[in-house]
């Protein structure tokens, strides 16, 4: 199944009067690794929510798709950004989670994420099996991008032990590729990814299409989808690429007050233009896309907002 993801509709007006919170507090929000898109998105959400909920304060921390879900479940954070495939795994306790994570609720989907796997053009890597004995760089262990990179390698019949692997942030991965200490880079992010643009400015790279191993990837995580990375997303990309995809979404502790989460959800819909300054795919986001069923229960506060705009979502 190939799904060509397109953002729906037009942006909501940014200025909307929102109800005051009855429970203003200091909340911890987990975002992404240094050099990625989630940290600036988290900064925008912080500003939006602090204005929408008088007296509130949000602390923004780095994190990752898997770590953020665990952090909320373990009480280390109240809000975070996450990837739909990882959160769906957490709901059932599927690896890398060791038990069902029942205190994590969905607020809103934001935009599609693309798994991108690139190699240095002069590294003579024509198929993934050519990576045996070579160097690969990806995100820290447990990060969603690292998990998908491992699945991608395993779907091709290899293991990390077949190569030298660095588990670092995007910035370090790019530097390793630039200086030749790594010849392959696996990451998931919105597109175009700043890390790949940075790398491409210094080195010629080659993208790997992923249709040939999609069935094998589904065996490792049934939530994976095939989505289209449109031609022209990157310089010298002259054709559409089919890649593994999923959605970035906002999650929160199910224990957060309903009214606060209602306000947070409504303020996302009201400020898509602001969020689009750091995540362009959010520019055309509308409530139906925010409320997409990704296999994760919604917070009652989010459900309250969606009901207000004529959308029914699952809260259990």
Task: Spell out what each predicted region is.
Residues 84-86, 93-95, 123, 159-256:
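Pocket-lining segment of extracytoplasmic ligand-binding domains
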Residues 138-151, 224-294:
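Ligand-binding clefts/hinges and TM-proximal coupling segments of bilobed small-molecule sensing domains
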Residues 1-10:
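Bacterial N-terminal signal peptides that target proteins for export
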Residues 18-24:
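Sec/Tat signal peptide C-region and signal peptidase I cleavage site
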Residues 168, 172, 178-179, 189-207, ...:
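An extracytoplasmic/periplasmic, membrane-proximal ligand-sensing/linker region
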Residues 79-111, 190-193:
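Acidic, polar ligand-binding/catalytic clefts
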Residues 27-52, 56-59, 113-179, 273, ...:
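Bilobed "Venus flytrap"/periplasmic-binding protein-like clamshell domains
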Residues 11-12, 22:
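Cleavable N-terminal signal peptides
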């Amino acid at each position: 199944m190939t799904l060509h993801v397109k953002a729906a509709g037009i942006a909501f007006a940014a200025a909307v009067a929102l109800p005051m919170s009855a429970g203003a507090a200091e909340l911890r929000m987990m975002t992404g690794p240094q050099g990625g898109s989630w940290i600036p998105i988290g900064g925008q959400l912080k500003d939006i929510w602090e204005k929408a909920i008088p007296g509130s304060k949000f602390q923004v921390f780095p994190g990752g798709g898997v770590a953020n879900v665990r952090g909320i479940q373990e009480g280390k954070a109240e809000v975070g950004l996450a990837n739909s495939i990882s959160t769906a795994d957490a709901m059932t306790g599927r690896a890398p989670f060791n038990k069902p994570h029942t205190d994590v609720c969905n607020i809103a989907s934001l935009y599609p994420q693309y798994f991108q796997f690139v190699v240095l053009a002069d590294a003579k890597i024509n198929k993934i099996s050519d990576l045996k004995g070579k160097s690969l760089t990806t995100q820290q262990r447990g990060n969603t991008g690292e998990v998908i990179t491992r699945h991608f390698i395993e779907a091709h019949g290899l293991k990390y032990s077949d190569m030298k692997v660095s588990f670092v942030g995007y910035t370090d991965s790019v530097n390793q590729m630039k200086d030749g200490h790594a010849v392959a880079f696996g990451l998931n992010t919105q597109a175009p990814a700043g890390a790949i643009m940075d790398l491409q400015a210094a080195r010629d790279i080659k993208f790997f299409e992923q249709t040939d191993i999609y069935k094998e990837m589904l065996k490792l995580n049934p939530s994976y989808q095939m989505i289209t990375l449109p031609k022209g997303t990157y310089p010298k990309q002259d054709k559409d690429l089919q890649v593994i995809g999923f959605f970035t979404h906002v999650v929160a502790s199910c224990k957060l007050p309903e009214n606060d989460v209602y306000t947070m959800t409504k303020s996302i819909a009201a400020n898509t233009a602001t969020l689009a300054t750091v995540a362009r795919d959010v520019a055309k986001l509308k409530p139906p896309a925010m409320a997409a069923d990704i296999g994760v229960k919604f917070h009652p506060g989010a459900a309250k907002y969606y009901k207000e705009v004529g959308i029914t979502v699952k809260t259990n």
